[in-house]
Amino acid sequence: MSESHSLGKNGERLAIKYLRQNGYKVLEKNWITGRKEIDIIAEDDEFIIFIEVKTRMADFQLHPRDTVSVHKQRNIIFAAQTYIQRNEIEKEARFDIITVVVEGAKHELEHIKDAFYPTL
């Protein structure tokens, strides 16, 4: 496993731990439809939440949230629509980003709710 892949998987583990500690129910990890993937699908009482996790080292020049391109957002939205249809979900959808910035043995996690909208 490459170092960046390992870093990303660690970020996803931290994100899932955070979500569970904050009352979210994690439904899926790395859910794939065709060539599109959603890192985490979770829910709370009100929303079905599609979450992109971005993990970077502290010395990376861009903040992780700035690396989620419009193209990536469209792919997540398309995959989310497929998931909602296949599973007959009736809750309102929300699209979040969780960023994890790693510096040595420490990390900083940020949960950005409503990070983007399906009107793209």
Predicted regions and their residues:
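Acidic-basic catalytic patches of nuclease active cores, encompassing PD-(D/E)XK
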Residues: 1-29
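Short acidic/glycine-enriched loop/turn segments that link adjacent beta-strands
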Residues: 33-36, 105
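Secondary-structure boundary/capping motif
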Residues: 24-25, 29-30, 49, 110-115
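Short, glycine/acidic-enriched loop or turn micro-motifs at the edges of active sites
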Residues: 31-33, 55, 99
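Conserved catalytic cores of phosphodiester-cleaving nucleases, focusing on short active-site segments
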Residues: 19, 38-60, 76
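Domain-level recognition of nuclease-like catalytic cores that cleave nucleotide substrates
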Residues: 86-120
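Mg2+/Mn2+-dependent nuclease catalytic core
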Residues: 57-77, 82
